[in-house]
Amino acid sequence: DVKWKTINLYFANKSGDALVKNSKRICYNKNVSVEKVVMEQLIKGTTESGCYQSIPSNTKLLSISVVDRICYVNLSQEFATDMVNAKSNVTIYSIVNSLSGLEGIDGVKILVKGNSNLMYRDAISLDTVFYMNNELVKKDLSDN
């Protein structure tokens, strides 16, 4: 059985200093959680004009679950060590905003190989729950 759903994915803009919202209609197996589908789409990236890869494409999603309205995203080491042309906060909030937009999810906790006690790119502590941040989102694609 499949389900159809429109999701909002947040990718980096061309300069990597802001997020671009990309609405997408997806078809997925109802045995797979929509948050897993969202993360797979973010990792895969997009060909949409004005949207650029925000997460290293060889990142692996090790696990994802929702407990008490917090989505726990456990990613492989590549997430922390491989680079994309996006500022640290853009990468973090591409995940947070994409998942926080889903029903039943208020916040996001990011782990790397099960560990959240680390600094992402020496800039952002992962030892916290992140919430939607609309300040990073470009309102107009022509701003790229």
Locations of regions flagged by a protein language model:
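Bimodal "functional hotspot" detector
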Residues: D1-N144
